[in-house]
Amino acid sequence: MSDNLSLHGTTILCLKKNEEIIIAADGQVSHGNTVLKSTARKLRTIANNKIIAGFAGSTADGLALFEKLAVKIEQHKHNLLRSAVELAKDWRSDKYLRRLEAMMIVADRSHILILTGNGDVVEPEKNVAAIGSGGLFALSAARALMSYENNLTAEEIALKSMNIAADLCVFSNHNIIMEKVV
């Protein structure tokens, strides 16, 4: 069985509503068709919770990229956009980094960014982004809830969307962890 299944075996969702920014992740770690762990933490904070990152893909690769992003953020005085672009440049040009199999969503008060395995930096539309095998389910649910359920908070939308994704994606579970950008 190919290890490529582990590349997308998770759900990470980030959304902004009424100046509240939430990143959510499921807790399942899979290898092929086997669940290795159900309580993993796929979210990390930088700069006293001012920047939060979630990663999908190889755990070791995701952590390596997170560490490199943290260094860039310190170098560029907590400027997330510039740090992400500089990381993407390194990701594309470095022989070792090009082989990493991970994607990240990072957010601060001003930006939600997707960092792809190709070294792309994408700022999504409509204040919502998702990655991983359950990402499209979570993204669709969040967009629908944001459009039609005006009384829900960002946290409620994230939780409902993640639960829908976990119902549909066999590589995601209902052990949802959420972090709020402060």
Swiss-Prot record:
Chain sites annotated for binding Na(+): 166, 169, 172
Domain of life: Bacteria
Modes of activity regulation: Allosterically activated by HslU binding.
Secretion signal span: none
Main location: cytoplasm
Gene Ontology biological-process annotations: proteolysis involved in protein catabolic process
Catalytic activity: ATP-dependent cleavage of peptide bonds with broad specificity
Molecular function, one GO term: metal ion binding
EC supergroup of this enzyme: hydrolase
EC number(s) reported in the record: 3.4.25.2
Gene3D superfamilies, per database record: Glutamine Phosphoribosylpyrophosphate, subunit 1, domain 1
Keyword Protease: yes
Keyword hit for Hydrolase: yes
Active site: 10
Pfam family, one: Proteasome
Keywords: Allosteric enzyme, Cytoplasm, Hydrolase, Metal-binding, Protease, Sodium, Threonine protease
Family: Belongs to the peptidase T1B family. HslV subfamily.
Annotated protein name in UniProt: ATP-dependent protease subunit HslV
Gene name of the encoded protein: hslV
